[in-house]
Curated annotation (Swiss-Prot):
It comes from the Bacteria. Signal peptide: none annotated. GO terms for molecular function: ATP binding; metal ion binding; protein folding chaperone; protein-folding chaperone binding; unfolded protein binding. It is found in: Cytoplasm. InterPro entries: Chaperonin_GroES, Chaperonin_GroES_sf, Chaprnonin_Cpn10_CS, GroES-like_sf. This is Co-chaperonin GroES. GO terms for biological process: chaperone cofactor-dependent protein refolding. The lineage of its organism: Bacteria, Pseudomonadati, Pseudomonadota, Alphaproteobacteria, Rhodospirillales.
Length: 103
């Protein structure tokens, strides 16, 4: 099944965080918090301004984004958990450095 969000909504798949701390301590599942980082899976067509003109979204499919702890609505599509949120719930886009892109 394909899901297409409406207006200024986006579908985000959470990106799992590291299982270990920088010091090498393994974090058990019970102590983990849900990650606040994800990848954009689908985007809506955009919002409309007062005159009815369509305003495109700043994020696109494939972007890695940061969002608030309580942002979005959790849904399960084809057995996979996603978040549906408005673009305004996204705090920013993570951009890979040029060295990481080359590798």
């Amino acid at each position: 099944m394909r899901f297409r969000p409406l207006h200024d909504r986006v579908v985000v798949k959470r990106v799992e965080s590291e299982q270990k701390t920088a010091g090498g301590i393994i974090i058990p599942d019970t102590a983990k918090e849900k990650p606040q980082e994800g990848e954009i899976i689908a985007v809506g067509s955009g919002a409309r301004d007062e005159s009815g003109k369509l305003i495109a979204l700043d994020v696109k499919v494939g972007d890695r984004v940061l969002f608030g702890k309580w942002s979005g609505t959790e849904v399960k599509i084809d057995g996979v958990e996603y978040l549906i949120m408005k673009e305004s719930d996204i705090m920013g886009v993570l951009e890979a450095s040029s060295a990481a892109k080359a590798a």
